[in-house]
């Protein structure tokens, strides 16, 4: 463990239970005489690996609402075949309540990308993923704030649905006020009429290095 760190949670027991089920551990352990001079036995190996270097690694993410209602996400983590572009887009889509196709992920350009320590140390899904979550939460607040201006109401009267922002309590028809505004309209009006692009940048670092766990079983003869 780094810096005397104590693991606050562990699912190693679930890994072991699953691998025992997959290999038929209870029927085969510790060994089985095949009756032909051969014996079969089973064994289990377990491992853990920290996620990022605690108190050292940092990840940053920028997400922007475009004038067409789609999102642009700029990251500093390089996709070296690990699929992190897809993984981080999935995280953002979950947070923003939208489809993955609504998010365009831009590859790394160290001249302009937000800073990231790098795609190493099993850190991207955990560290950069949490930076995505923080960025999405900040961006949603900005979207709601801008929608409140357009709908002439308080921010606490609105909710973000993913495709639009709407009033929690609808106003009567004929009142002269709208009950809902689409994300496309928000992005378009913010960028084209207010000279303002809705975007957010957040960073994430971790005081701990939470480890994923694994268990594997083998049968030998």
Which residues does each predicted region cover?
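Short conserved active-site loop signatures built around small residues
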Residues: 103
């Amino acid at each position: 463990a780094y810096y005397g760190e104590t693991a606050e949670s562990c699912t190693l027991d679930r890994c072991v239970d699953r691998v025992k089920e997959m290999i038929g551990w209870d029927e085969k352990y510790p060994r089985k005489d095949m009756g032909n001079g051969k014996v079969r036995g089973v064994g289990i190996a377990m491992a853990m690996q920290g996620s990022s270097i605690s108190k050292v690694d940092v990840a940053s993410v920028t997400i922007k609402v475009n004038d067409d209602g789609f999102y642009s996400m700029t990251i500093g983590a390089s996709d070296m075949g690990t699929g992190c572009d897809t993984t981080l887009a999935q995280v953002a889509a979950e947070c923003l309540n939208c489809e993955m196709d609504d998010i365009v992920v831009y590859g790394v350009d160290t001249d302009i990308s937000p800073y990231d320590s790098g795609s190493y140390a099993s850190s991207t899904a955990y560290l950069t993923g949490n930076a995505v979550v923080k960025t999405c939460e900040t961006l949603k607040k900005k979207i709601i704030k801008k929608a409140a201006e357009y709908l002439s109401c308080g921010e606490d009267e609105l909710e973000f649905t993913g495709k639009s922002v709407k009033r929690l309590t609808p106003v009567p028809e004929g009142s002269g006020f709208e009950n809902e505004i689409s994300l496309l309209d928000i992005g378009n009006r913010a960028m084209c009429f207010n000279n303002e692009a809705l975007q957010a940048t957040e960073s994430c670092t971790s005081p701990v290095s939470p480890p994923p766990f694994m268990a594997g079983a083998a049968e030998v003869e």
